[in-house]
Protein backbone atom coordinates (compact mmCIF):
# COMPACT_ATOMS: atom_id res chain seq x y z
CA UNK A 1 0.00 0.00 0.00
CA UNK A 2 1.17 3.47 -0.78
CA UNK A 3 0.97 6.69 1.19
CA UNK A 4 -1.54 8.27 -1.17
CA UNK A 5 -4.70 9.67 0.35
CA UNK A 6 -8.07 8.03 -0.15
CA UNK A 7 -9.66 8.79 -3.45
CA UNK A 8 -12.72 10.99 -3.37
CA UNK A 9 -14.99 10.51 -6.33
CA UNK A 10 -16.23 13.80 -7.71
CA UNK A 11 -19.32 14.23 -9.82
CA UNK A 12 -19.84 17.13 -12.15
CA UNK A 13 -23.00 18.02 -13.98
CA UNK A 14 -23.28 18.63 -17.69
CA UNK A 15 -22.99 22.37 -17.13
CA UNK A 16 -21.41 23.00 -13.69
CA UNK A 17 -20.81 26.73 -14.25
CA UNK A 18 -24.27 27.25 -15.74
CA UNK A 19 -22.74 29.04 -18.73
CA UNK A 20 -25.44 27.85 -21.11
CA UNK A 21 -28.05 29.80 -19.20
CA UNK A 22 -25.88 32.86 -18.54
CA UNK A 23 -24.76 33.19 -22.19
CA UNK A 24 -28.27 32.78 -23.56
CA UNK A 25 -29.47 36.30 -24.42
CA UNK A 26 -32.70 35.20 -26.05
CA UNK A 27 -34.46 34.19 -22.84
CA UNK A 28 -37.38 36.23 -21.51
CA UNK A 29 -35.72 37.38 -18.28
CA UNK A 30 -32.68 38.78 -20.08
CA UNK A 31 -34.79 40.74 -22.56
CA UNK A 32 -37.13 42.03 -19.87
CA UNK A 33 -34.26 43.30 -17.70
CA UNK A 34 -32.67 45.03 -20.69
CA UNK A 35 -35.96 46.84 -21.35
CA UNK A 36 -35.96 48.01 -17.72
CA UNK A 37 -32.46 49.50 -18.11
CA UNK A 38 -30.23 46.68 -16.99
CA UNK A 39 -27.01 45.94 -18.86
CA UNK A 40 -24.90 42.76 -18.85
CA UNK A 41 -22.17 43.00 -16.19
CA UNK A 42 -24.14 45.27 -13.82
CA UNK A 43 -25.76 44.19 -10.58
CA UNK A 44 -29.42 44.07 -9.61
CA UNK A 45 -31.20 46.31 -7.12
CA UNK A 46 -30.46 49.78 -5.77
CA UNK A 47 -26.73 49.20 -5.41
CA UNK A 48 -25.08 48.99 -8.88
CA UNK A 49 -21.91 47.23 -7.68
CA UNK A 50 -23.76 44.25 -6.14
CA UNK A 51 -23.19 40.61 -7.07
CA UNK A 52 -22.88 40.28 -10.82
CA UNK A 53 -22.14 36.57 -11.06
CA UNK A 54 -24.90 34.25 -12.15
CA UNK A 55 -26.31 31.29 -10.25
CA UNK A 56 -24.14 28.17 -10.32
CA UNK A 57 -25.60 24.70 -9.87
CA UNK A 58 -23.67 22.25 -7.68
CA UNK A 59 -24.31 18.55 -7.05
CA UNK A 60 -24.60 17.43 -3.42
CA UNK A 61 -22.13 14.56 -3.11
CA UNK A 62 -21.91 14.18 0.69
CA UNK A 63 -24.08 13.17 3.63
CA UNK A 64 -23.87 16.51 5.43
CA UNK A 65 -27.03 18.32 6.36
CA UNK A 66 -28.30 21.43 4.61
CA UNK A 67 -26.30 24.46 5.65
CA UNK A 68 -23.26 22.53 6.96
CA UNK A 69 -20.93 23.97 4.34
CA UNK A 70 -22.28 27.48 4.90
CA UNK A 71 -21.64 27.15 8.63
CA UNK A 72 -18.09 26.09 7.86
CA UNK A 73 -17.62 29.21 5.74
CA UNK A 74 -18.96 31.48 8.51
CA UNK A 75 -15.81 31.19 10.67
CA UNK A 76 -15.09 34.43 12.47
CA UNK A 77 -11.29 34.12 12.34
CA UNK A 78 -8.49 31.62 12.01
CA UNK A 79 -8.96 30.61 15.68
CA UNK A 80 -12.59 29.63 15.26
CA UNK A 81 -12.13 25.86 15.39
CA UNK A 82 -15.80 24.98 15.95
CA UNK A 83 -16.23 21.72 17.83
CA UNK A 84 -12.84 20.22 16.97
CA UNK A 85 -11.16 19.19 20.24
CA UNK A 86 -7.40 19.50 20.70
CA UNK A 87 -6.98 22.10 17.98
CA UNK A 88 -6.45 24.91 20.50
CA UNK A 89 -3.30 23.18 21.79
CA UNK A 90 -1.97 22.95 18.25
CA UNK A 91 -2.72 26.62 17.68
CA UNK A 92 -0.83 27.57 20.86
CA UNK A 93 2.14 25.58 19.65
CA UNK A 94 2.08 27.34 16.29
CA UNK A 95 1.81 30.70 18.02
CA UNK A 96 4.82 29.90 20.22
CA UNK A 97 6.83 28.98 17.14
CA UNK A 98 5.77 32.12 15.28
CA UNK A 99 6.27 34.42 18.25
CA UNK A 100 2.53 35.24 18.70
CA UNK A 101 1.91 33.08 21.76
CA UNK A 102 0.34 35.82 23.90
CA UNK A 103 -2.11 36.95 21.20
CA UNK A 104 -3.28 33.41 20.43
CA UNK A 105 -3.59 32.52 24.13
CA UNK A 106 -5.76 35.59 24.80
CA UNK A 107 -7.98 34.78 21.82
CA UNK A 108 -8.42 31.13 22.85
CA UNK A 109 -9.18 32.09 26.47
CA UNK A 110 -11.80 34.50 25.24
CA UNK A 111 -13.40 31.80 23.08
CA UNK A 112 -13.42 29.36 26.01
CA UNK A 113 -15.10 31.95 28.24
CA UNK A 114 -17.76 32.62 25.60
CA UNK A 115 -18.45 28.90 25.25
CA UNK A 116 -18.87 28.54 29.02
CA UNK A 117 -21.27 31.48 29.17
CA UNK A 118 -23.29 30.74 26.04
CA UNK A 119 -23.38 26.96 26.00
CA UNK A 120 -22.28 23.63 27.38
CA UNK A 121 -20.58 20.85 25.42
CA UNK A 122 -21.47 22.45 22.11
CA UNK A 123 -25.10 23.13 23.12
CA UNK A 124 -26.18 26.76 23.04
CA UNK A 125 -29.16 27.50 25.24
CA UNK A 126 -31.74 30.08 24.21
CA UNK A 127 -33.88 31.73 26.85
CA UNK A 128 -37.52 31.02 26.00
CA UNK A 129 -39.24 32.62 28.99
CA UNK A 130 -41.34 35.14 27.05
CA UNK A 131 -42.18 35.66 23.41
CA UNK A 132 -42.13 39.44 23.70
CA UNK A 133 -39.02 41.45 22.99
CA UNK A 134 -36.81 42.30 25.98
CA UNK A 135 -35.53 45.54 24.41
CA UNK A 136 -37.41 48.79 24.83
CA UNK A 137 -36.68 50.86 21.71
CA UNK A 138 -38.10 54.12 23.13
CA UNK A 139 -36.23 54.11 26.45
CA UNK A 140 -33.28 52.17 24.98
CA UNK A 141 -33.02 49.71 27.84
CA UNK A 142 -33.76 46.08 28.63
CA UNK A 143 -37.19 45.14 29.97
CA UNK A 144 -37.17 42.96 33.10
CA UNK A 145 -39.97 40.37 33.34
CA UNK A 146 -38.78 38.72 36.56
CA UNK A 147 -41.45 38.58 39.28
CA UNK A 148 -43.44 41.26 37.51
CA UNK A 149 -46.83 39.71 38.13
CA UNK A 150 -46.30 38.02 41.49
CA UNK A 151 -45.12 41.01 43.52
CA UNK A 152 -47.27 44.16 43.67
CA UNK A 153 -45.78 47.52 42.77
CA UNK A 154 -44.59 49.55 45.75
CA UNK A 155 -46.64 52.56 44.73
CA UNK A 156 -49.90 50.63 44.35
CA UNK A 157 -52.88 52.06 46.19
CA UNK A 158 -54.91 50.39 48.95
CA UNK A 159 -57.92 50.12 46.66
CA UNK A 160 -55.98 47.90 44.24
CA UNK A 161 -54.86 45.67 47.10
CA UNK A 162 -58.40 45.39 48.45
CA UNK A 163 -59.76 44.62 44.97
CA UNK A 164 -57.13 41.91 44.56
CA UNK A 165 -58.08 40.38 47.93
CA UNK A 166 -61.76 40.56 47.06
CA UNK A 167 -61.13 38.82 43.74
CA UNK A 168 -59.18 36.06 45.49
CA UNK A 169 -61.99 35.63 48.02
CA UNK A 170 -64.62 35.37 45.28
CA UNK A 171 -62.53 32.79 43.43
CA UNK A 172 -62.07 30.79 46.62
CA UNK A 173 -65.82 30.83 47.36
CA UNK A 174 -66.59 29.70 43.81
CA UNK A 175 -64.12 26.87 44.17
CA UNK A 176 -65.64 25.76 47.50
CA UNK A 177 -69.15 25.87 46.02
CA UNK A 178 -68.04 23.85 43.04
CA UNK A 179 -66.46 21.20 45.27
CA UNK A 180 -69.60 20.98 47.43
CA UNK A 181 -71.81 20.68 44.36
CA UNK A 182 -69.65 17.90 42.95
CA UNK A 183 -69.74 16.02 46.27
CA UNK A 184 -73.53 16.37 46.45
CA UNK A 185 -74.01 15.14 42.88
CA UNK A 186 -71.70 12.23 43.56
CA UNK A 187 -73.63 11.27 46.69
CA UNK A 188 -76.99 11.52 44.91
CA UNK A 189 -75.70 9.38 42.10
CA UNK A 190 -74.46 6.77 44.57
CA UNK A 191 -77.79 6.70 46.47
CA UNK A 192 -79.71 6.38 43.22
CA UNK A 193 -77.54 3.46 42.19
CA UNK A 194 -78.00 1.72 45.55
CA UNK A 195 -81.80 2.15 45.35
CA UNK A 196 -81.82 0.70 41.86
CA UNK A 197 -79.78 -2.32 42.98
CA UNK A 198 -82.09 -2.91 45.98
CA UNK A 199 -85.17 -2.67 43.78
CA UNK A 200 -83.73 -5.17 41.29
CA UNK A 201 -82.89 -7.60 44.11
CA UNK A 202 -86.41 -7.29 45.55
CA UNK A 203 -88.05 -7.90 42.17
CA UNK A 204 -85.82 -10.89 41.57
CA UNK A 205 -86.71 -12.36 44.96
CA UNK A 206 -90.46 -11.85 44.41
CA UNK A 207 -90.24 -13.46 40.99
CA UNK A 208 -88.42 -16.43 42.45
CA UNK A 209 -91.08 -16.91 45.16
CA UNK A 210 -93.85 -16.58 42.60
CA UNK A 211 -92.28 -19.21 40.34
CA UNK A 212 -91.87 -21.54 43.29
CA UNK A 213 -95.51 -21.09 44.33
CA UNK A 214 -96.79 -21.73 40.82
CA UNK A 215 -94.65 -24.85 40.62
CA UNK A 216 -96.10 -26.14 43.87
CA UNK A 217 -99.67 -25.55 42.72
CA UNK A 218 -99.14 -27.22 39.35
CA UNK A 219 -97.51 -30.32 40.83
CA UNK A 220 -99.85 -33.40 40.71
CA UNK A 221 -99.68 -35.76 43.66
CA UNK A 222 -100.39 -39.49 43.55
CA UNK A 223 -103.64 -39.08 45.52
CA UNK A 224 -104.89 -36.53 42.99
CA UNK A 225 -103.98 -38.86 40.17
CA UNK A 226 -105.87 -41.81 41.76
CA UNK A 227 -108.88 -39.70 42.64
CA UNK A 228 -111.69 -40.14 40.06
CA UNK A 229 -112.61 -37.09 37.99
CA UNK A 230 -116.09 -35.61 37.96
CA UNK A 231 -116.37 -36.07 34.23
CA UNK A 232 -115.95 -39.83 34.64
CA UNK A 233 -118.94 -40.02 37.01
CA UNK A 234 -121.30 -38.78 34.33
CA UNK A 235 -122.18 -41.70 32.11
CA UNK A 236 -123.82 -40.74 28.86
CA UNK A 237 -127.07 -42.36 27.82
CA UNK A 238 -126.90 -45.49 25.77
CA UNK A 239 -127.07 -44.97 22.09
CA UNK A 240 -128.72 -47.66 20.04
CA UNK A 241 -126.34 -48.08 17.22
CA UNK A 242 -124.68 -50.93 15.51
CA UNK A 243 -121.68 -50.35 17.84
CA UNK A 244 -123.69 -50.92 20.99
CA UNK A 245 -121.49 -53.86 22.04
CA UNK A 246 -118.41 -51.64 22.04
CA UNK A 247 -120.28 -48.90 23.84
CA UNK A 248 -121.26 -51.35 26.55
CA UNK A 249 -117.65 -52.43 27.01
CA UNK A 250 -116.54 -48.78 27.31
CA UNK A 251 -119.18 -48.12 29.97
CA UNK A 252 -117.99 -51.10 32.00
CA UNK A 253 -114.42 -49.82 31.80
CA UNK A 254 -115.45 -46.36 32.96
CA UNK A 255 -117.41 -47.86 35.83
CA UNK A 256 -114.31 -49.74 36.95
CA UNK A 257 -112.29 -46.53 36.87
CA UNK A 258 -114.94 -44.76 38.95
CA UNK A 259 -114.61 -47.27 41.77
CA UNK A 260 -111.72 -46.23 44.02
CA UNK A 261 -111.51 -49.63 45.63
CA UNK A 262 -111.21 -51.35 42.27
CA UNK A 263 -108.45 -48.93 41.25
CA UNK A 264 -106.52 -49.69 44.43
CA UNK A 265 -106.71 -53.38 43.62
CA UNK A 266 -105.54 -52.76 40.07
CA UNK A 267 -102.53 -50.66 41.20
CA UNK A 268 -101.94 -52.97 44.21
CA UNK A 269 -102.24 -50.12 46.68
CA UNK A 270 -103.06 -50.99 50.29
CA UNK A 271 -104.51 -48.46 52.72
From Swiss-Prot:
Its main location: nucleus. It comes from the Eukaryota. It is found in: Nucleus, Nucleolus. Residues 165-205 have a biased composition (Basic residues). Residues 25-71 form the G-patch domain. GO terms for molecular function: nucleic acid binding. SMART domains: G_patch. InterPro entries: G_patch_dom, PINX1. GO terms for biological process: rRNA processing. GO terms for cellular component: nucleolus. Residues 1-26, 149-233 are annotated as: Disordered. Residues 17-26 have a biased composition (Polar residues). Keywords: Nucleus, Ribosome biogenesis, rRNA processing. Residues 206-230 have a biased composition (Basic and acidic residues). Belongs to the PINX1 family. Involved in rRNA-processing at A0, A1 and A2 sites and negatively regulates telomerase. This is Protein PXR1.
Amino acid sequence: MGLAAARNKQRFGLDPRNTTWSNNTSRFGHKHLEKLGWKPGSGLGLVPDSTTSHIKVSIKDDNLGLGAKLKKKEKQDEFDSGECTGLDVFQRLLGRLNGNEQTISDELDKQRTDNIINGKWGIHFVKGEVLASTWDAENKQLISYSMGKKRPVEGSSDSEVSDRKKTKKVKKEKKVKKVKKEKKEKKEKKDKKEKKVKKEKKEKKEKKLKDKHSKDTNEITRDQMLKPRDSAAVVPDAVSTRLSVRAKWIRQKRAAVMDAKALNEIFMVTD
